[in-house]
Amino acid sequence: MAANEHGGKLLEVSGLTMDFGGLRAIDDVGLDIFAGEIVALIGPNGAGKTTFFNCVTGIYEPTLGEVRIHPPGGASRRINGMKPNRITALGMARTFQNIRLFPAMTVLENVMIGRHCRTSTSIVDAILGSRKAAREEQECVEKSYQLLKKVGLAEVAGEFSRNLAYGAQRRLEIARALATDPFLLLLDEPAAGMNPQETHELDALITRIRDEEKVAILLIEHDMKLVMNISDRIYVMEYGKKIAQGTPQEIKENPKVIEAYLGEEAHA
């Protein structure tokens, strides 16, 4: 398996193509993610970025191409056609462009929902209140609370998620995704709607997740300051095609990217 300066390959996407009727939303896109990386996927609205995420995470089955994961210490596996919950259980988690929390549940309970894919308690054990069920529930609470501390939400663990400010809800979604113990985390526009201070805090949080949790990150984002600050590599899409890939500096200087997305001001 290939490796770069960070580590072994975790995600390998080749020839990914997605058709909706007569519309080709993604056209022959390839992408690799390696251990220890933060990688950004950028491009104009409608470029196909979220559709790409949906194909990789099992919401859509690609028309053509292959999506393959290489879990650390595990066997390489083709995941085309797998259900999203199965892909999550294999170690690839995501957040969504539109926040998808459970508003009538507490902040802690929202994270615990994510953690339950790592428990093995049966329905019978849960109903009977077995020792195993009690032990796993306590472990779930403790793990979830630790994740809330990591994202700065431990003090509001008992609040309903609907009462959180927008930026805090974004961080709660990240905590819930981390509760699944992923080796790769996909973030779909995590800074959307955030003010500059919240975006600055998110910048630090994403880097901490990579460094402390040993989780690689693939993110879609329009905030170019955030992208350029934290990314090891960047892929650029336009009209469903990949038009460039490289380091932040290479992307800043790429004429195709400047014309399609960044503009001359970003290059200056």
Task: Label every model-predicted segment.
Residues 2-268:
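Glycine-rich phosphate-binding loops of nucleotide-dependent enzymes
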